[in-house]
Each structure stands twice: as structure tokens, then as C-alpha cells.
């Protein structure tokens, strides 16, 4: 019985990793939701480690890169999301150390700006709230708004 449970847990983990890269915590959470035993989960993680299929650093790099392209976010939001996915503070700090918040802030603002209606004061207020919600720091937001409304 335990062997089939181990195999099912491993097969599910492989299927999940085939869809996209996952953090260690995500794999654990998804296996726990399916009611796999702690022993089966531990064996699955051990096998995934041996095969080099689970790597939190690689996951974090891909996650930040994907976010940067699809839905630019600030360091605060990225830090929170990575922490929620079980990435260690050390890895998060290393990955985000060379993240250019100002460039991504401008990119996010330029994508949103054409859809804003109203006078400049209203647009500025809405854009500030949008960027703050995306996790950008106030300094980057002010620089971006000054750059947009200067032209």
C-alpha cells in the first residue's frame, strides 16, 4: 500500500512540474491537499532532489522574470509572493538585489496610462494607487509619475 502511495505522490509531483516549475512548499501543499502521507511526501521530495527537478532558487528566478514581463510588480509585492511560495529570505534577497524597480514601475504605468480617463490630477491619483498596489515603493512611483506627466 505504501509503495503505491509513494508512486502516486511522485507521479503527481512530476505531472505538476511538467506544467510549470514549482517551489518545494507548493509541491508539499499540493500533495498534502491530496491527503498523501507525510512519509510519501518526504520520499517524493527526496527523489525530486536527487533528480534535480526541484530548485527554489531557479523557481524564484523564473517567477521574477515572468512577473517582470507579464505583470510588472515592485520588490515589496514580489518579496511577499515569493515568501508565500516558501522561498527563503536569503534567496529572495539575492534574486531581488539587482531588480530595477524604477524601470518596471515605468513599464507598468505606461501599460495602464492609456486606459485612464479624466483630468491629470485624477489620472495621477489613480496611477499612484495602481502602482502602490503592485508593490512599488513611493520613490519609484513619484519618479515615474513625474516622468509621465512632464511630457
Swiss-Prot record:
Transmembrane segments: none annotated. GO terms for biological process: regulation of DNA repair. GO terms for cellular component: cytoplasm. InterPro entries: RecX_HTH_1st, RecX_HTH_2nd, RecX_HTH_3rd, Regulatory_RecX, WH-like_DNA-bd_sf. The keyword Protease does not apply. It comes from the Bacteria. Gene3D superfamilies: Winged helix-like DNA-binding domain superfamily/Winged helix DNA-binding domain (1.10.10.10). It is found in: Cytoplasm. The keyword Glycosyltransferase does not apply. Keywords: Cytoplasm. Disulfide bonds: none annotated. Modulates RecA activity. Belongs to the RecX family. This is Regulatory protein RecX. It comes from Chlorobium phaeobacteroides (strain BS1).
